[in-house]
Amino acid sequence: MAKYLVIVESPAKVKTIKKFLGKNYEVMASNGHVRDLPKSSLGIDVDGDFEPKYITIRGKGEILAKLRKEAKKADKIYLATDPDREGEAISWHLLHALKLEGKAVSRISFNEITKNAVKESLKHPRKIDMDLVDAQQARRVLDRIVGYKISPLLWAKVKRGLSAGRVQSVALRIICDREDEINAFIPEEYWSLDATVDVEGEKKPITAKLYGRGDNKIAISSKEEMDKVLNEIKGKDCKVQNIKKGQRSNKAPLPFTTSTLQQEASKALNFPISKTMRIAQQLYEGVDIKGQGTVGIITYLRTDSVRVSDEAEAMAKDFISKSYGDKYLSTGEGTKKSSKNIQDAHEAIRPTDINRVPSEIKESLSRDQFRLYQLIWKRFTASRMAKSEYETTTVKLSVGDYVFSFATSRLLFDGFELAYTAADDAKKEKQPVLKNPLTEESLLTVEELLPKQHFTQPPAHYTEASLVKTLEELGIGRPSTYSPTISTILARRYITKESKNLYVTEIGEVVNSIMKESFPTIVDEHFTANMESLLDAVAEGKVNWKTVVENFYPDLKDAIDKAENELEKVTIHDEVTDEICPECGRNLVIKYGPHGKFLACPGFPDCRFTMPYLEKIGVNCPKCGKDVVLKKTRKGRKYYGCIDNPECDFMSWGRPVAEKCPRCGGYMIIKGNKIACADEQCGYVTDKKPEREE
C-alpha cells in the first residue's frame, strides 16, 4: 500500500510523475479546479465582507471521492499543483474539499516535470502560501462581480449571450480604438526615389535611396515636385561623397516568456495563441520520448520571468562550448532585470535539458510539437550565446546637388545567429554586400532612376500577437489570462479574425460603446493595470484582498444602477444573405449557435427553416465547377468540399487555389508556405507565398 499521495492537476502529469517515484507513492489528478463560485448565483456576499461561497464543481464529486479514499490511507499527502497563483488556489481548494485540515499535508511545486525536479521538490515541502491564494481569490471575485453584474445589463439592453469582463472589456476597447484610428486615417501622398547604380568591378548594381539636397533631408509630396527633382538630376555625374565605416553588434535575445512565446509562435509558425498554449502544455506535462519514456521537455509555460536556474545555465554553457566552441559563449552582458510585472520565482520557458536536441527527438513528437519545441530550444540556446558582430558601411553619393545613400554590412562573427533568427529579423530586407571596398575614386554610373508614389498607411490592425504585446506593455492581465481573454472575445463574436488580423464586429462596437459610456473605469487601461498591481501587492502580502474588492465595488454598483435606468435598448440587425428560404422565399439571415454560424429564415416562428452556413472560399470545384466551401469534421478538423455535396464528392484537406497545375492540369492547394499540386505523384511546387487562412 502506498504511504504517500501526490495530487496533481492533470492525468497527463500523473503518467509522467508516476515513473519518477517508487511504489510508496500514489499519484492522482484533480482534473483542474474542484471548487468554484456557483453558476446560478453571484456567490459573493457583497452586502457583507465579500466572502466567496464556493461549491463543488458539477462532475467533480466522483473524483473527490476517489481522492478522499486514497487520502485516508496515506501517511502524508503532497499537493503538487502548478507553480503559480492558480495552482496555489487549487491546492487550497483541495485541502478544504478533501477535509485535510489537521492532517499531514504539504505543498510542493516544481518548474519542470523531470525526475530531478520532482524528487527535489519532495525534499522541500512547505505550507500553502495564502498570499498567493488570496491574490487568486481577489482576481476571481473581481472578475465574477464585473461579469455577473454587467452581463445581465447587456442581455437586457442588447441581446442575450453577451458578456463583459474586467480584462476582456479593456482588450475589446483597445481593438476598437485601433479600428477608430484606421477609419479616421487620412492618407497623405509622398514620393521616394531610388537610383540603381553600377559600381565598377561589381556584377550587380546597388540601389541607393534619395536622402536630400546638400546637407538637408527632403520630402517629396507630389508628382510635380518629383518631376522637378528628376529634371535636375538627369545627366549629372554620380560620385562618392562620403564613406562612413563602423561596427554594430546584435545582442542575443532573451529566453521566452509566455507573451513572447505567443508572439513569436504566431509570427514564425502561424500558430493562434490558443494553439501555442495547448501544444506548450503537452510539452510541459510530458511526451513519450523514444528510449527515455514520458518526460516533460519544457519548463512551466505561464511565466513573465526571463530568469534561468543555475543548473540550466551551467548545462547550456557546457552544451554551447562543446557544440559551437568557447567563443560562442555569452559574456553575460545585457542581462535583463526583472520587470515590475513578474510574478513569484518563475523561470523563463526553456527546454528542461538543452542536450535534448530537437532533431534527435523529432520522431517522438507530432509536427506541431516539434516545431514549437524547436523554437523554444533555439531561442534558449541563442539566449546563452555571444552577440553577433557586423562591420557596417554607410555610403553617401552625390548626383548633382542631390545626395543618395545606401548601407552595407558584413558579418564578422555570427554569435547567437548561428542558432536562431527571430521571425521579424528574418523578414528584414537584406543589405547589399560589395565584393570590393568602395573608395572616393570608385567609378559609378547611374543606370536608372526609379520614382515611386506612396501614400501613408493607417496603423495596422491588431493581430493576436500584437494584441498580447500591447496588453503586456500596458500591464493588463498576466501570462495565464492572455489566451483566454482573446478566446473569449472571439467566441462572443465581438471580433473576427481574417488572415491573422482582428476586426471589430457590429456587436463588438455596440458592447464597447456601452462599456465606455456606462463603465468608463472598467475599460480604462490605466485603472486595469493598477488593479493588476494591487493583485501583485496581495500576492506579496502587502494588501488585504478584501480591501481591494471593498474599494472597487461601490462605484461599480452606482454605475450599474445608473445604466439600468438611463441606457436605451439597442437593436442589432441580423446579417442578410443572398440565400433564399426554399419554404417562404425570404432572404436567409446569419445566426449564431453553440457550434458557430448557421442560416435561418427571418420569418421565425412562422417559418422555422434553417441550414448550415457554408463559407465559400472563392474557388470553383475542380470536378463540377460549383463553389468550394470550408467545412469541418465532427471533431472540428477543417476540410474543403463542393457545395453540391453529396451530388459532387470533391473533398480536399488542403485549401484549393484558383490556378491549375501547369505540369499535370490538376488542382493546386496551399501546402505549408507554398502552393503545390494536390497530386503528390506530380510533385509540382510554386515559389508563390499564399495568403494564409487561420
Predicted regions and their residues:
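Intrinsically disordered, low-complexity regulatory segments
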Residues: 1-137, 211-212, 223, 335, ...
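Basic, low-complexity terminal or inter-domain segments flanking catalytic cores
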Residues: 2-5, 16, 25, 151, ...
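Conserved short loop/turn motifs at secondary-structure junctions
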Residues: 82-83, 159-163, 245-254, 266-269, ...
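C-terminal or mid-to-C-terminal helical accessory/interaction module adjacent to the motor/catalytic core
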Residues: 113-195, 246
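Core structural elements
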Residues: 139-149, 167, 197-199, 248-260, ...
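Metal- or metallocofactor-binding catalytic centers and their adjacent structured scaffolds
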Residues: 215-254, 442
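Short acidic, hydrophobic short linear motifs in intrinsically disordered regions
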Residues: 243, 251-265, 292-301, 458-470
